[in-house]
Amino acid sequence: MENILGLMSKDDWIYTGLLLFSFGASCYVRKIGNNILASGALGFAMSLFIIGPKIVYSLGICSIAISIQLLANKKSTPLYVFLTTFTYLMFVRFAHYILPVNEVASHTNVIQLIITLRIIGITFEENDAWVHKSDENPTKRYLTELPTILEKFAYFYHFCGLFTGPYYTYQMLIDSQNPILKSWDPTLEVKSRFVRLLWSVPVFVITNHYFPLDILRSDAIWEVSFFTRLVYAALIFVVFKTRVYSAWAIAESICVILGIGIYPAASNPKIIMGPTDLNAFDKLKTRENIEMSSDAIVNLDIPKVEFSDGFRDGMKAWNRSVQTWLALYVHSRVKVMRVETTMLVSAVWHGTYAGYFMSFGVVAMCAILEDVIFKLVPVDTETGVRPKWFRILYTHTIRCRGFEMLATGFLLKNAYDVHHFWSSIYYWLPLLCIPFYIYSAKISKPKKAQKSE
C-alpha cells in the first residue's frame, strides 16, 4: 500500500479522489435532472469537507461581488468587480502574514481561483447583455436569463470544474438545461477522453516517480552537464503536462455528462463562447438526433501543445478556457501593452510566487521574440508554411526548450529555487528575448507617432 501511495503526492491523491467523486456525482446528477441549485449545493458541501473553515475566503468575495453588482453603476460594475476581486485575492494570499489566519494554499487556493474567474465572468456577461439589450441583430450571443442571487452562488460553487477547471460561462450552464440533452448520449465523448488516460496516467506516474522536481532544487543539478539539465527540464515538463492531460480528461468528461459545452456541431461552437453561427443554432437547438460537439469545453488541443510551430499557438492550445477568459476580459479591453498586461493578470491570478511572474513575464517577451523572428523568416507563398529547416530548428530550440524552462519556473515557484535552476542553464531564454523585446519597442514607437500625427 505504501508503494502505491508513494506514486503520487498527497495533493495529487486528493485531486484524484475529488475528480473521481465528481465524475460519479455528475452521472447521478444527470440521472435525477441536472439541477443547477443542487449541483451548487453539492460543490459547496465538497468544498466545506475539503477545506473546512477556509471556505469563508471564497464566501467573502462572493458576497462582496454580488453586493457591487446590486449597488454599483451598471456601466462601471465590471471594472469595480474586476479590481475588487483581484485586490481581495491578493489580500487573502498575504493575510496570514499579518493576521492569525490560515494561509490560502493548495485546494483552498484552487477554489479561490475558479470562483474568481466565475465572479468576473458572470459580471461581464450581465453587463454585455445590458449594453446590447436593444440590438435587433446581435452578432454574438448574450446572457439569455439574468440569474438570481441564489443562482449566482450555485454557479460560483457548482461542483463541475470547481477543483480543476475548465472555466465555463453562466450562459453555458443555462444551455446545459436544454431538454434535448437529456436524450443525447455522451458515451462516445467520454470514451474518447478516457482513451487519453490509458497513456497519460502511466506516463505521469512513471516520470513523476523517477524524475522528481526536487532535483532542480538540489545542488546535484550543478554536478551534471548543461545538456543533462535541459533533458531533466524536458522530463519535468512531461510530468507537468501528463498530470494536466489526465486531470482535464476527467474534468471535461464531467462537463460533457452534464451537458455543459454541448452544442449542435453545425453552430460552430468555440471554447467558452458557445455557438458562433447563431442562425444554425436557433434552427437546431431544439432538434434531437443531430451531431453534437463539445468544442466549447475542450480545454486542451494536445497536438498543438506538442507540435505547434510557435509560442503563441502553443499557449493558445493550453488551458484554452482560461486563455479565452483572459482574451475576452483583459486583452481585448486594455489599450496599451496588451500582452504584458494579460500575462501580468495571469501571473497574479495564479499566485504570488516569484516563479509565476518570472515565467509569465518571459512569456510576454517570447511572444515579441517570435513576432520579430517570424517577420525575418516569412511564410512561403507557395507552400503556406515557413521553410522546413527553420521550423525544425526553431521548434526544437527556442520553442520546445523555452516552454520547458518556463514550466520549471512555474513549478518551482520560489524565487530562490527558480534562480537556482535558471542560473544553471544561464538564463538563456530571458537573455535571448531581451534584445528582441527592446528592438520591437523601439521600432513600434515611430509607427505610433505617425498614427497620432
Curated annotation (Swiss-Prot):
Q: In which pathway does it act?
A: Lipid metabolism; phospholipid metabolism
Q: List the Gene Ontology MF annotations in alphabetical order.
A: lysophospholipid acyltransferase activity; O-acyltransferase activity
Give me any GO biological process, just one: phosphatidylinositol biosynthetic process
List the glycosylation sites: N319
Q: What is its EC number?
A: 2.3.1.-
Q: So where's the catalytic machinery, residue-wise?
A: H350
Question: Where does it sit, as one GO cellular component term?
Answer: membrane
User: What is one Pfam family matched by this protein?
Assistant: MBOAT
List localization entries: Membrane
Alphabetic keyword roster: Acyltransferase, Glycoprotein, Lipid biosynthesis, Lipid metabolism, Membrane, Phospholipid biosynthesis, Phospholipid metabolism, Transferase, Transmembrane, Transmembrane helix
Summarize the protein's role: Acyltransferase which mediates the conversion of lysophosphatidylinositol (1-acyl-sn-glycero-3-phosphatidylinositol or LPI) into phosphatidylinositol (1,2-diacyl-sn-glycero-3-phosphoinositol or PI) (LPIAT activity). Prefers sn-2-LPI rather than sn-1-LPI as the acyl acceptor. Lysophospholipid acyltransferases (LPLATs) catalyze the reacylation step of the phospholipid remodeling pathway also known as the Lands cycle. Involved in the selective incorporation of arachidonoyl-CoA ((5Z,8Z,11Z,14Z)-eicosatetraenoyl-CoA) and (5Z,8Z,11Z,14Z,17Z)-eicosapentaenoyl-CoA (EPA-CoA) into PI.
**InterPro entries, alphabetically?**
LPLAT_7/PORCN-like, MBOAT_fam
Q: What is its main location?
A: membrane
Q: Any S-S bridges, and between which cysteines? A: none
Q: Which PANTHER family match?
A: LYSOPHOSPHOLIPID ACYLTRANSFERASE 7, PORCUPINE
The phenotype of cells or organisms lacking this gene is: Mutants show larval arrest at an early developmental stage and egg-laying defects; 14% of mutants accumulate unlaid eggs that hatched internally.
Q: In which tissues is it expressed?
A: Expressed ubiquitously throughout development from early embryo to larval and adult stages. In adults, strongly expressed in pharyngeal muscle, body wall muscle, vulval cells, distal tip cells, intestinal cells and spermatheca.
Q: Which domain of life is it from?
A: Eukaryota
- Which positions, given as ranges, span the membrane? 4-24, 36-56, 79-99, 154-174, 195-215, 220-240, 244-264, 354-374, 421-441
Report the membrane topology from the UniProt record: Multi-pass membrane protein
Say which enzyme class the record assigns.
transferase
Q: What is this protein called?
A: Membrane-bound acylglycerophosphatidylinositol O-acyltransferase mboa-7
| Gene name per UniProt | mboa-7
Q: Which organism is it from?
A: Caenorhabditis elegans
Reaction(s) catalysed by this chain, per the record, are: 1-octadecanoyl-sn-glycero-3-phospho-(1D-myo-inositol) + (5Z,8Z,11Z,14Z,17Z)-eicosapentaenoyl-CoA = 1-octadecanoyl-2-(5Z,8Z,11Z,14Z,17Z-eicosapentaenoyl)-sn-glycero-3-phospho-(1D-myo-inositol) + CoA; a 1-acyl-sn-glycero-3-phospho-(1D-myo-inositol) + (5Z,8Z,11Z,14Z,17Z)-eicosapentaenoyl-CoA = a 1-acyl-2-(5Z,8Z,11Z,14Z,17Z-eicosapentaenoyl)-sn-glycero-3-phospho-(1D-myo-inositol) + CoA; a 1-acyl-sn-glycero-3-phospho-(1D-myo-inositol) + (5Z,8Z,11Z,14Z)-eicosatetraenoyl-CoA = a 1-acyl-2-(5Z,8Z,11Z,14Z-eicosatetraenoyl)-sn-glycero-3-phospho-(1D-myo-inositol) + CoA
Q: Which family does it belong to?
A: Belongs to the membrane-bound acyltransferase family.
